[in-house]
A protein has these predicted regions:
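Short, surface-exposed connector motifs at secondary-structure boundaries
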Residues: 1, 25-31, 132-134
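Short, solvent-exposed amphipathic alpha-helical segments in soluble enzyme
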Residues: 17-20, 47-51, 150-156, 178, ...
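Internal gly/pro-rich beta-alpha loop/helix module
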Residues: 10-127
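Short, glycine-/Ser/Thr-/acidic-enriched flexible segments
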Residues: 140-143, 168, 185-187, 220-221, ...
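Cysteine-nucleophile active-site neighborhood
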Residues: 186-261
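C-terminal and late-domain segments of enzyme folds
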Residues: 128-131, 144-156, 160-162, 245-252, ...
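Inter-motif core of Ras-like GTPase G domains
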Residues: 1-7
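Phosphate-binding active sites in nucleotide-utilizing proteins
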Residues: 131-208
Length: 331
Protein backbone atom coordinates (compact mmCIF):
# COMPACT_ATOMS: atom_id res chain seq x y z
CA UNK A 1 0.00 0.00 0.00
CA UNK A 2 1.72 3.16 -1.24
CA UNK A 3 0.89 6.49 0.43
CA UNK A 4 1.66 9.43 -1.86
CA UNK A 5 2.00 13.04 -0.73
CA UNK A 6 -0.01 14.60 -3.55
CA UNK A 7 0.02 18.16 -2.22
CA UNK A 8 2.15 19.50 -5.10
CA UNK A 9 1.26 16.94 -7.78
CA UNK A 10 -1.22 16.37 -10.55
CA UNK A 11 -0.26 14.12 -13.50
CA UNK A 12 3.24 13.66 -12.03
CA UNK A 13 1.66 11.47 -9.34
CA UNK A 14 1.27 8.80 -12.03
CA UNK A 15 5.00 8.93 -12.74
CA UNK A 16 5.77 8.46 -9.05
CA UNK A 17 3.42 5.50 -8.66
CA UNK A 18 4.64 3.94 -11.91
CA UNK A 19 8.24 4.30 -10.70
CA UNK A 20 7.56 2.60 -7.38
CA UNK A 21 5.54 -0.14 -9.10
CA UNK A 22 8.32 -1.07 -11.55
CA UNK A 23 11.53 -0.24 -9.68
CA UNK A 24 11.82 -3.53 -7.77
CA UNK A 25 10.11 -6.60 -9.29
CA UNK A 26 9.96 -8.23 -5.84
CA UNK A 27 7.60 -5.50 -4.57
CA UNK A 28 3.96 -5.43 -5.64
CA UNK A 29 2.18 -2.11 -5.19
CA UNK A 30 -1.39 -3.26 -4.72
CA UNK A 31 -3.02 0.06 -3.91
CA UNK A 32 -2.49 3.78 -3.45
CA UNK A 33 -3.65 6.29 -0.84
CA UNK A 34 -3.43 9.94 -1.85
CA UNK A 35 -2.48 12.24 1.02
CA UNK A 36 -2.85 16.03 1.43
CA UNK A 37 -5.22 16.43 -1.51
CA UNK A 38 -6.35 20.03 -2.03
CA UNK A 39 -9.90 19.81 -3.43
CA UNK A 40 -12.44 17.71 -5.31
CA UNK A 41 -10.99 18.96 -8.60
CA UNK A 42 -7.48 18.05 -7.49
CA UNK A 43 -8.63 14.55 -6.53
CA UNK A 44 -10.29 14.07 -9.94
CA UNK A 45 -7.08 15.04 -11.74
CA UNK A 46 -5.06 12.61 -9.65
CA UNK A 47 -7.46 9.72 -10.17
CA UNK A 48 -7.59 10.35 -13.94
CA UNK A 49 -3.79 10.40 -14.15
CA UNK A 50 -3.48 7.15 -12.18
CA UNK A 51 -6.27 5.27 -13.95
CA UNK A 52 -4.14 3.88 -16.84
CA UNK A 53 -1.73 2.26 -14.37
CA UNK A 54 -4.31 -0.20 -13.09
CA UNK A 55 -3.32 0.39 -9.45
CA UNK A 56 -6.47 0.99 -7.38
CA UNK A 57 -6.78 4.26 -5.46
CA UNK A 58 -8.09 3.20 -2.05
CA UNK A 59 -8.61 6.68 -0.67
CA UNK A 60 -7.76 10.37 -0.75
CA UNK A 61 -7.17 12.37 2.42
CA UNK A 62 -7.61 16.15 2.31
CA UNK A 63 -5.01 18.61 3.48
CA UNK A 64 -5.88 19.52 7.09
CA UNK A 65 -3.61 21.57 9.33
CA UNK A 66 -5.40 20.25 12.41
CA UNK A 67 -3.85 16.83 11.75
CA UNK A 68 -0.27 18.10 11.44
CA UNK A 69 2.19 17.36 14.24
CA UNK A 70 4.36 20.32 15.32
CA UNK A 71 8.12 20.09 14.80
CA UNK A 72 11.23 21.30 16.58
CA UNK A 73 15.00 20.79 16.35
CA UNK A 74 14.98 16.96 16.61
CA UNK A 75 11.85 16.25 14.59
CA UNK A 76 8.31 16.02 15.89
CA UNK A 77 7.30 17.29 19.32
CA UNK A 78 6.67 14.07 21.31
CA UNK A 79 3.09 13.12 22.10
CA UNK A 80 4.08 12.96 25.79
CA UNK A 81 4.37 16.77 25.75
CA UNK A 82 1.04 17.37 24.03
CA UNK A 83 -1.17 14.52 25.15
CA UNK A 84 -4.50 16.33 24.81
CA UNK A 85 -3.75 17.79 21.37
CA UNK A 86 -2.23 14.52 20.17
CA UNK A 87 -5.25 12.55 21.36
CA UNK A 88 -7.61 14.94 19.59
CA UNK A 89 -5.56 14.71 16.37
CA UNK A 90 -5.67 10.89 16.46
CA UNK A 91 -9.44 10.95 17.07
CA UNK A 92 -10.01 13.33 14.17
CA UNK A 93 -7.67 11.34 11.91
CA UNK A 94 -9.67 8.21 12.66
CA UNK A 95 -12.87 9.96 11.60
CA UNK A 96 -11.28 11.22 8.38
CA UNK A 97 -9.88 7.79 7.50
CA UNK A 98 -13.25 6.18 8.16
CA UNK A 99 -14.90 8.56 5.67
CA UNK A 100 -12.27 8.80 2.96
CA UNK A 101 -10.54 5.41 2.81
CA UNK A 102 -11.86 2.14 1.44
CA UNK A 103 -11.01 0.20 4.59
CA UNK A 104 -12.47 -3.04 3.22
CA UNK A 105 -10.22 -2.65 0.20
CA UNK A 106 -7.20 -2.13 2.46
CA UNK A 107 -8.08 -5.32 4.38
CA UNK A 108 -8.53 -7.30 1.16
CA UNK A 109 -5.13 -6.11 -0.02
CA UNK A 110 -3.55 -7.13 3.29
CA UNK A 111 -5.12 -10.60 3.10
CA UNK A 112 -3.76 -11.08 -0.41
CA UNK A 113 -0.15 -10.80 0.76
CA UNK A 114 1.86 -13.98 1.04
CA UNK A 115 3.29 -15.28 4.31
CA UNK A 116 6.34 -13.53 5.71
CA UNK A 117 9.58 -15.46 5.57
CA UNK A 118 11.73 -16.12 8.61
CA UNK A 119 11.04 -16.89 12.24
CA UNK A 120 8.78 -14.53 14.20
CA UNK A 121 10.70 -12.20 16.47
CA UNK A 122 10.45 -12.88 20.19
CA UNK A 123 11.98 -10.90 23.07
CA UNK A 124 12.16 -13.99 25.27
CA UNK A 125 15.70 -15.05 26.19
CA UNK A 126 16.67 -18.73 26.05
CA UNK A 127 17.27 -20.44 29.37
CA UNK A 128 16.18 -19.47 32.87
CA UNK A 129 16.44 -15.75 33.72
CA UNK A 130 18.72 -14.56 36.52
CA UNK A 131 16.74 -14.00 39.73
CA UNK A 132 16.16 -10.56 41.19
CA UNK A 133 17.18 -8.40 38.22
CA UNK A 134 15.64 -4.92 38.46
CA UNK A 135 16.50 -2.22 35.93
CA UNK A 136 15.62 1.43 36.57
CA UNK A 137 14.61 3.14 33.30
CA UNK A 138 14.65 6.93 32.88
CA UNK A 139 11.32 8.22 31.59
CA UNK A 140 9.34 11.45 31.49
CA UNK A 141 9.48 14.16 28.83
CA UNK A 142 13.27 14.59 29.07
CA UNK A 143 13.91 10.90 28.28
CA UNK A 144 11.14 9.87 25.93
CA UNK A 145 13.19 8.37 23.07
CA UNK A 146 13.33 4.65 23.74
CA UNK A 147 12.70 1.69 21.47
CA UNK A 148 9.83 -0.23 23.04
CA UNK A 149 11.45 -3.45 21.81
CA UNK A 150 14.50 -2.69 23.95
CA UNK A 151 12.27 -2.65 27.01
CA UNK A 152 10.60 -5.88 25.87
CA UNK A 153 14.03 -7.48 25.52
CA UNK A 154 14.96 -6.45 29.07
CA UNK A 155 11.73 -7.97 30.37
CA UNK A 156 12.25 -11.04 28.20
CA UNK A 157 15.70 -11.49 29.74
CA UNK A 158 14.08 -11.57 33.19
CA UNK A 159 14.28 -7.96 34.38
CA UNK A 160 11.65 -6.08 36.31
CA UNK A 161 11.57 -2.52 34.95
CA UNK A 162 11.27 0.38 37.38
CA UNK A 163 10.52 3.75 35.77
CA UNK A 164 11.59 7.11 37.17
CA UNK A 165 11.67 10.72 35.96
CA UNK A 166 15.11 12.36 36.37
CA UNK A 167 13.45 15.78 36.33
CA UNK A 168 11.07 15.14 39.23
CA UNK A 169 11.75 11.86 41.06
CA UNK A 170 13.27 12.29 44.51
CA UNK A 171 15.49 9.22 44.22
CA UNK A 172 16.24 6.12 42.23
CA UNK A 173 13.73 3.25 42.43
CA UNK A 174 14.36 1.01 45.41
CA UNK A 175 16.23 -2.17 44.64
CA UNK A 176 17.46 -1.14 41.20
CA UNK A 177 20.46 -3.16 40.06
CA UNK A 178 21.12 -1.21 36.85
CA UNK A 179 20.20 2.10 35.19
CA UNK A 180 19.11 2.59 31.59
CA UNK A 181 19.20 6.23 30.47
CA UNK A 182 17.87 6.45 26.92
CA UNK A 183 17.59 9.32 24.49
CA UNK A 184 15.37 12.34 24.67
CA UNK A 185 15.56 16.07 25.19
CA UNK A 186 17.71 16.89 28.24
CA UNK A 187 18.61 20.21 26.62
CA UNK A 188 14.94 21.28 26.73
CA UNK A 189 14.64 20.29 30.41
CA UNK A 190 18.18 21.14 31.50
CA UNK A 191 16.98 23.50 34.25
CA UNK A 192 14.68 20.89 35.82
CA UNK A 193 17.32 18.16 35.57
CA UNK A 194 19.97 20.39 37.12
CA UNK A 195 17.69 21.58 39.92
CA UNK A 196 16.91 18.00 40.96
CA UNK A 197 20.16 17.72 42.91
CA UNK A 198 19.14 14.69 45.07
CA UNK A 199 18.47 12.56 41.99
CA UNK A 200 21.68 13.69 40.27
CA UNK A 201 23.64 12.77 43.37
CA UNK A 202 21.91 9.39 43.56
CA UNK A 203 22.92 8.64 39.97
CA UNK A 204 26.49 9.74 40.65
CA UNK A 205 26.79 7.52 43.72
CA UNK A 206 25.18 4.59 41.89
CA UNK A 207 27.77 4.83 39.13
CA UNK A 208 30.64 5.45 41.56
CA UNK A 209 29.78 2.16 43.26
CA UNK A 210 30.50 0.36 40.00
CA UNK A 211 26.87 -0.49 39.30
CA UNK A 212 25.77 -0.99 35.67
CA UNK A 213 24.68 2.20 33.90
CA UNK A 214 23.85 2.28 30.19
CA UNK A 215 23.31 5.71 28.61
CA UNK A 216 22.71 6.72 25.02
CA UNK A 217 22.62 10.21 23.51
CA UNK A 218 20.42 12.19 25.94
CA UNK A 219 21.54 9.88 28.72
CA UNK A 220 25.16 10.61 27.80
CA UNK A 221 24.54 14.36 28.21
CA UNK A 222 22.89 13.76 31.59
CA UNK A 223 25.95 11.86 32.87
CA UNK A 224 28.34 14.68 31.86
CA UNK A 225 29.64 17.30 34.30
CA UNK A 226 27.45 19.97 32.78
CA UNK A 227 25.15 20.78 29.87
CA UNK A 228 25.46 24.35 28.58
CA UNK A 229 26.80 25.41 31.96
CA UNK A 230 24.10 23.71 34.04
CA UNK A 231 25.28 21.03 36.44
CA UNK A 232 24.49 17.46 35.48
CA UNK A 233 25.44 14.20 37.22
CA UNK A 234 29.22 14.46 36.90
CA UNK A 235 29.60 10.74 36.31
CA UNK A 236 31.75 11.38 33.23
CA UNK A 237 34.79 13.64 33.09
CA UNK A 238 33.33 15.49 30.13
CA UNK A 239 31.29 18.59 29.38
CA UNK A 240 28.31 18.78 27.03
CA UNK A 241 27.02 21.71 25.01
CA UNK A 242 24.49 22.40 22.30
CA UNK A 243 26.12 23.38 19.01
CA UNK A 244 23.35 24.27 16.58
CA UNK A 245 24.97 21.85 14.12
CA UNK A 246 23.17 18.65 13.20
CA UNK A 247 24.95 15.32 13.58
CA UNK A 248 22.89 12.71 11.77
CA UNK A 249 23.60 9.35 10.21
CA UNK A 250 23.77 5.60 10.44
CA UNK A 251 26.86 4.14 12.09
CA UNK A 252 28.77 0.87 12.19
CA UNK A 253 30.78 0.37 15.36
CA UNK A 254 32.81 -2.19 17.28
CA UNK A 255 33.07 -2.40 21.07
CA UNK A 256 36.66 -1.64 22.07
CA UNK A 257 36.39 -3.10 25.56
CA UNK A 258 33.99 -5.17 27.59
CA UNK A 259 31.28 -3.31 29.50
CA UNK A 260 27.97 -3.85 31.24
CA UNK A 261 26.34 -3.74 27.79
CA UNK A 262 28.72 -5.25 25.25
CA UNK A 263 31.50 -7.79 25.09
CA UNK A 264 34.74 -6.52 23.54
CA UNK A 265 34.64 -6.95 19.78
CA UNK A 266 30.84 -6.82 19.49
CA UNK A 267 29.84 -5.21 16.19
CA UNK A 268 26.70 -3.08 16.01
CA UNK A 269 24.77 -0.79 13.72
CA UNK A 270 23.08 2.28 15.13
CA UNK A 271 22.35 5.90 14.42
CA UNK A 272 23.18 9.37 15.72
CA UNK A 273 20.77 12.32 15.72
CA UNK A 274 21.68 15.34 17.82
CA UNK A 275 22.73 18.98 17.91
CA UNK A 276 25.21 18.62 20.75
CA UNK A 277 28.85 17.82 21.42
CA UNK A 278 30.62 16.15 24.32
CA UNK A 279 34.23 17.14 25.03
CA UNK A 280 36.22 14.96 25.04
CA UNK A 281 34.30 12.77 22.60
CA UNK A 282 35.76 9.59 24.13
CA UNK A 283 37.16 8.53 27.47
CA UNK A 284 40.33 6.62 28.30
CA UNK A 285 38.32 3.48 27.51
CA UNK A 286 36.06 4.41 24.57
CA UNK A 287 32.78 2.57 24.17
CA UNK A 288 33.06 2.12 20.41
CA UNK A 289 35.34 2.39 17.42
CA UNK A 290 32.96 3.99 14.91
CA UNK A 291 33.70 3.16 11.30
CA UNK A 292 35.14 6.20 9.53
CA UNK A 293 34.93 8.37 12.65
CA UNK A 294 37.19 6.87 15.31
CA UNK A 295 36.75 6.23 19.06
CA UNK A 296 33.52 7.40 20.69
CA UNK A 297 31.83 7.16 24.07
CA UNK A 298 32.89 6.11 27.54
CA UNK A 299 33.37 2.90 29.49
CA UNK A 300 34.28 3.39 33.14
CA UNK A 301 33.47 0.96 35.95
CA UNK A 302 29.95 -0.22 35.21
CA UNK A 303 29.15 2.76 32.96
CA UNK A 304 28.65 2.44 29.20
CA UNK A 305 27.77 5.83 27.65
CA UNK A 306 27.61 6.76 23.98
CA UNK A 307 25.82 8.86 21.39
CA UNK A 308 24.75 5.74 19.48
CA UNK A 309 21.09 4.76 19.50
CA UNK A 310 20.95 0.96 19.24
CA UNK A 311 18.03 -1.36 18.54
CA UNK A 312 18.92 -4.34 20.70
CA UNK A 313 16.86 -6.85 18.70
CA UNK A 314 19.86 -7.08 16.37
CA UNK A 315 22.12 -8.03 19.31
CA UNK A 316 19.87 -9.62 21.98
CA UNK A 317 22.95 -10.74 23.90
CA UNK A 318 23.43 -7.09 24.96
CA UNK A 319 20.22 -6.68 27.00
CA UNK A 320 20.81 -10.15 28.45
CA UNK A 321 24.28 -9.06 29.50
CA UNK A 322 22.86 -5.94 31.17
CA UNK A 323 20.19 -7.95 33.00
CA UNK A 324 22.79 -10.40 34.28
CA UNK A 325 24.87 -7.48 35.51
CA UNK A 326 21.79 -6.00 37.20
CA UNK A 327 21.23 -9.29 39.01
CA UNK A 328 24.87 -9.39 40.09
CA UNK A 329 25.47 -12.57 38.13
CA UNK A 330 28.20 -11.12 35.93
CA UNK A 331 28.42 -10.93 32.16
Amino acid sequence: LLVVDASAMARSAAAVVHGYSTFDPRVRVGGVVLNRVGSDAHERMLREALSPLGVPVLGALRRDGRLAAPERHLGLVPAAERRRAAGEAVRRLGEVIGRRLDLEGVLRLARSAGPLEGEPWSPEAPGPPPPGARVAVASGPAFSFLYEENLELLRGAGAELLFFDPASSEGLPEGAGALYLGGGFPEVYAAELSENRPLREAVRLFAAAGRPVVAECGGLLYLARSLDGREMCGVLDAGARMTGRLTLGYRRARALSGSSLAEAGTEVRGHEFHYSAVEPAAGERPAWEVEGRGPEGFVAGGVHASYLHLHWAARPQMPRRLVRAAAGVGA
